UniProtKB/Swiss-Prot annotation:
Main localisation: cytoplasm
Gene giving rise to this polypeptide: rsmJ
GO MF annotation terms: rRNA (guanine-N2-)-methyltransferase activity
EC number: 2.1.1.242
Name the record gives this protein: Ribosomal RNA small subunit methyltransferase J
Amino acid sequence: MQLQLICEDPSQQSHLDELAARWQLSHTDDSDFALVLTTERLELRKVDEPKLGAIFVDLIGGAVGHRRKFGGGKGQAIAKAAGLNKGATPTVLDGTAGLGRDAFVLASLGCKVQMVERHPVVAALLDDGLARAKHDPEIGTWVSERMSLIHASSHDALEQLAQDKDFLQPDVVYLDPMYPHPENKKKSALVKKEMRVFQSLVGADLDADGLLAPAMALASKRVVVKRPDYADWLDEQKPSMAIETKKNRFDVYVKASMA
């Protein structure tokens, strides 16, 4: 993929070059997007809309850190959907990792989470945030033990992993495909910013319906699909149950009990 690659600290240029090679990114001055390596982190900027600010992964502080400390623990809807309220600590594969927030919540509650992210820029941002979190004195130990990243197309990855006899099947496959959101729906300023940037960079997951079948084949216990409250069921398949919040819905497709 081509976009602007900018290094703010000349001494870090070789690191940016390594990132570009790893994620198969190349520089062009013509892109509206810039992947910027600052002295602190990797971030994405929309050059033609500087007021949007930068997008980066922060698993230590901010909203994610606040949710880890005060977010309701295993009583959260996502935790219930994944089966944590039944006394289990399932292994999870997040097939649409994005910026890693939901995966981090599940990991903070004890789950081992493997994350799949198919877009190279998003994967690069997530990998950078994950690396910083692993070095944090407060959360670094368990982040290192419980969170890992796979960069691959979700469809291909789920299908290939399901056929891989050496791959330990996760108890839960979690999916949160990007969904085109109506302009009249209220979102937080942060989510609006990220959705605008991501939908122009990545686009909506128009092939998301194709994720459910390989996810069902891969998960040993259940598949959890996060949807906006106004969205249809994924692939028009009725879930076993749904857990609803104010703005979202977790559709749960049960294959086996969590016991």
